[in-house]
Amino acid sequence: MILLYLLWKILLVIVGAVMITISLCMIVKNEEKILERCLGSVADLCDEIIIVDTGSTDRTKEIARKYTDQIYDFVWIDDFSAARNFAFSKATREYIYSADADEVIDEENRQRFRLMKEAMLPEIEIVQMKYGNQMQYDTVYNYDEEYRPKLFKRLREFVWTEPIHETVRLDPVVYDSDIVITHLPESSHAKRDLANFHKHTVNGYRLPKRLHNMYARELLMAGDNEDLAQAAEFFRDSVNDEARSSDEMLEACCVLAKSARLNKDMAEFFKYTAKVLTTEACSEICCELGAFYEGERDFEEAAIWYYNAVYETQPILQLACGGELGLEGLIRCYRAIGLSRQADIYRQELERRKQEGSL
């Protein structure tokens, strides 16, 4: 074992890898139930711990003091980026690890983290880690596991590339690691996030394409009638905004169609479903049409649209529309019609997809 370790150290020297130093940066508020769980799993992996508190009224700071004396207050301004930037500005080590209080790194992945820390190549500027357990606890994610940027080089070095007509490399060097971070939230943040989206759009902030997609997705997956109604004006503007992409127009129509169906505004409902069907149909709109006809007890027509949602179109916001939700709609409709054998076929398909993890 000692020999293997020595060989490993020699290999690291040969390839130019060095032990890096890491600043852990976190923004927190009222995290007394979970903060110690998070810090206990990551504190010894980092060389500096920076906690930025945005207004805790519980024991959050007291718990944080067990791990660091670098605790800073930040007046909350409904801007997560501003708070994280403030935390990053306090970091002094080579790399910055950004964590949330509802994250945990288990022992297997702590070992992977240590190896990464020992073997980091100096040119790497961002390390992505797998964010796991995302679809538990009523979250609004489409995938149970996905890569997220978590470790960042604090000071970037610019490098010239290409032998003639040389240019500076602008894209960061990103490493996709095998480290898995377990997400263990206490509750859903959807209501908080939707309120923030609404506040910023009302104040005139133009959502970039990524946030436009996330706002629409969170509304479809977790929004209620009130959330959808509050967002309606913003998404109507998106539909008519020539500067928005076709993808954003489709996203807006999905939100507006659902809002109209729930409010029984049929003129608006068919207006926005038609806009999608005349361009490029998607699973979300097919599910909305299925839900409408199911509500009208026209189960044959509803089944057609649920079938289209699963087998003839692709989802653009909510993957479940092209899987679980569409199949469940087919099962309900065929049972209502009295075709139990057909319903069983789709029930078996649903179970198969669940077992394969393809929903």
Regions found by a protein language model. Give the residues of each.
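Acidic helix N-cap motif at the loop->helix transition within catalytic regions
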Residues: K33-E36, D58-Y67
